[in-house]
Amino acid sequence: GISVADLNDDGSYELLFTGYDDMIHVWNPIDGEELEGWPIDMESNSLTEPVTADLDNDGDLEVVTARKSGLAYIFHHDATPYNNFPASLGGNVESSPAIGDIDGDGDFEIVFGTTAGLKVLDIKEDMGERVSWKLHRGNLERTGSLGMTLVSNDREEGLTPSEFYVSANYPNPFNPS
């Protein structure tokens, strides 16, 4: 899956994703390039949607993901590995992690669903206030949206769509018969 976060604090969002190329990517859609230090080779494919939060209260987001084979990874915003990671989860991971202070002790826990059951990693550092994408599709409603609207004031012809058009849609959502 794809998640969205302003990893480099430039005011625009980057796209974070993993896949069958064994890499975790952080792509800047404005520049059309990966951020410096990214992608990172995890040496195995991943089915998780990366999640982001300030795990160590330094003001920067950390990126959390896992390999399908059961290794959890955490990277700082600049692509450097978090201390003591990767860490084995003891089972295959085919879902996205979730981040939150589930025990109310002031630090984050990261929950992974594995083939061996739920695994919880307790991050024993004061948690920061920044949480961008802390679970699958970004929120409990699974909207996959930050609630933002793309607005353009560019008047150059052809850049902004002037009409909505659907062609050769199958199955047709407007005429299901």
Each PLM stretch: what is its role?
Residues D154-S177:
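Glycine-centered coil/turn sites that cap beta-strands in beta-rich domains
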